[in-house]
Amino acid sequence: MRSFIKSHKNSNSLDGSQSRWNNSEVPNVQRSSADSFNYSGSTVISSNSNTVTSMSIPNNLPNSKNYSPKHTPSFESFHRLANKIPSKLFKKSSNNALNATYNNSLHLGESLSSPPTPRTINTSTDAIQKVRSTESEIEIPSIKGTITHSWGTRSDTGGHSIIVLNEPRSSLSGASNSDYSDLEPAARISGLKRPSIVSIKTNNSFEEYNSTPIITEEEDLKNFDSKIINPSTPNDINAVKYNNRKTQIIGNENLFRTSNLQNKVRKHFISPLENLNENVLEADNKQGVVENVQRKKKVPNLNASPQDTIDGNRSRTISFAETSKTLPQMEGASDADGESDSCSETTDDDDDDNTSKFSFEYNRPNGRTASMKYYSKPEPVNNIYIDDLYEDENFDENMNYDEDSLDGFEFPSNKFDYGNENSDENDDIQGHENYVVQDNNSSKGPKLKSEAPKKVQTYNDLFDLSDDFDYDPSDEYQNETRLIHEMCEDGEASQIDNMMVDENIISPQKSLTSSKSFNNSNVSKSSPLIKPLETPKKKIIVKPVASFADIFNLDDEEDRDFKDDDSCNDESDGEYVLKDPFNIPGGKNLLNRHKSLKKNSSFSLKKIPSNGDSIDNNLMDKKLDKYIVDINKSIKKHSDIPDLHFVPPDNSSDIILPKRSQSLKYHDLSSILDSDVPGSTRDLFFIDEAEEDSYNVKHGLTEEEYLDEINNVPEDFYFSDSEQDMSPMKSPFRRSNTGSFRRTHSFSGKPIGAAKDNTPVKSKLEIKNKTVTFFNHPWTPNSQSGFSGKSPKKSIKKTDNLENSEEEHLLATPKRDDSSAYGFSTPDRQFRKPTPEYLQDYSLSPIQEGYSSVDNSPR
């Protein structure tokens, strides 16, 4: 500290003395390596040029050893103080940073307070070597290597170039070095340069880059390779980096403006002929597209001779690949025009299979760039597997089974001709006697009759069975006709010839307007008519519901039959109603046809007769009236096969209507929905509450039985057993209140809104030093006590039942006098002494400590 004060005093005595400046020259003095700083001179880098100027110390100094420039004494004293402090606090790297900081302040101080006659000295290699020698003693020695191979284009110089890693390069030197390559980190490069100079040089390089004239490719490649390998000045380095940066950011507008250094597309490619080439290429591509479309649309002529094909039938085609190869095209032009890579191919001189597909930049701190070429891989098609069925098993993309390929099978979708517009024209032909009805599949050729499967006689015949046998609807037709003949053999064979069976129901593939008889002698146009078989039907006579008691006599099956028999008897609104289609032969087929025809909106019903003029007279029987369906009226409503609906009966004698004096209930009101819903609430049985109550009284049904059933009380539970035993222990209330109490407390597990414990109440009370036990002692009421009452007795009463007249044992209410009732009696103001029996019954005896009835009681 004393040396610091002493040096500070000496430095202050030298300030402001102009007499100390002498004309004698003082050589450049360099301090020792311990001071690690040179005060002999300073260098200043001018912003307008790349030259480095050195300012020397004036020669007329009296004492060169004690010389210190202005504003430097504080630094000198601080530097000495820092050398005396141990090196652990100030490491060598931090010391170098301080030296660099104060070196800059020294240059600024000398530039501001310079002597009157300074002398400038040009830069020389000796001065630069001295500065480098001082830094080489401190910094890490450099590492040299040799470039053996590189990506991209090789230089014309050839040979192996030497690279130097971590070269101790001073920021003061601006001379070119052929051995040097800028491979230092980006932070060090940016720290060695001033921001103002870098920004000025960047702008200058951008202007020079845009204003450069068009040069040849060879000269441009040589200059570019020389700049990359041997960058002479920071200006060239910045220009190369800026160009590389511009090549990374390429848009639609900058595609033809910037020079792509990586792909070597030079400026001489960009010329005024570029727009013309694009127009020609676009026109050729459009022509090729049109010709390819015309080629695809052209149907090949199978009957044409080979000579005709050679002469003129061969169409000219131009593919996209051939079009792109005929004209020079830049890489990326197809992307600008919106064309895919699969349709166009670019021809480049540098495209070779041996070259790398990666792009590499020289003199970049981070090395290889992230830009690379990606190749799209075709995604494999996922196969669809459904229970070991592959995608070729007639499944479409929506996982629906395709039935179009199964035309030979009998499916509902293959039974009708959709949109047969020529049905009107063929009506006259169908009326001919020799008219033959053909199937839909007749145009495909004669139908081969499938072999009938063998009958199963042995176990091995089971393996010969197959599902591939075609279903023939004629088999079903023959089976039905055979059943009809068998059923009608008994005296009804004469009606078979007159009975018309609609063949469309049995064989839907045939014409809908033609009908055949069993003898195949008469073919005429008629509406579909079905005559039912008159089979005897046994009806169960059910007593109609006239009272509330009749509801319990109904069975489920009887109730259903009762509703079905009386549902449809008469005609309503002039419409014919089909009674029960499932009881008629072929009625199910009619409903199935009705469902299938709803899907086909193009089905025509123009030729179905609306009146009965064309029907034969022998068919107009009264028995058939109820089964004839008037199709004309139903077509107006639904434009389809008529719906089979049921009409409620007109006579409602079985329904009990409410009296006018009674209150109207909710289910008696008719709503709009009642007319649409069959079997609405107005058809339900009316329940009279007065009649219901009389029925319950008549049969002895009370509300207590319903409550016991709700509370899950067992049927064999007899309340009198517990009532007789517990009657003395009950509270002495009136007997009339016990019924309501039992209705509310008849079940112990009835949910209440409180927490409870189902464990029985303990009969002992445990205290700190003893246990008190309570015993339930049965006692008989004594006449001397203040209580009076009688126990209930059983009485047998015979009741005559109106229906079964059986004797029932009922628990009668106990007989009681008017004077004696349950409850406290009025005292007679005569108090008697308690008898010993009373004291024995109602007094608590002392607890025996020796033995106790409770095992855990204390002794």
Swiss-Prot record:
Similarity remark: Belongs to the ZRG8 family.
Ranges annotated as biased composition (Low complexity): 40-57
Region Disordered, annotated ranges: 1-72, 296-374, 722-758, 776-859
Annotated organism of origin: Vanderwaltozyma polyspora (strain ATCC 22028 / DSM 70294 / BCRC 21397 / CBS 2163 / NBRC 10782 / NRRL Y-8283 / UCD 57-17) (Kluyveromyces polysporus)
Lineage: Eukaryota, Fungi, Dikarya, Ascomycota, Saccharomycotina
GO CC annotation: cellular bud neck; cellular bud tip; cytoplasm
Bias kind Acidic residues: ranges: 334-353
Purpose: Involved in maintenance of polarized growth and daughter-cell-specific transcription.
Record key words, sorted: Cytoplasm, Zinc
Annotated localization: Cytoplasm; Bud; Bud neck; Bud tip
Skewed-composition ranges (Basic and acidic residues): 797-819
Ranges annotated as biased composition (Polar residues): 10-39, 58-72, 302-327, 776-788, 842-859
Protein name: Zinc-regulated protein 8
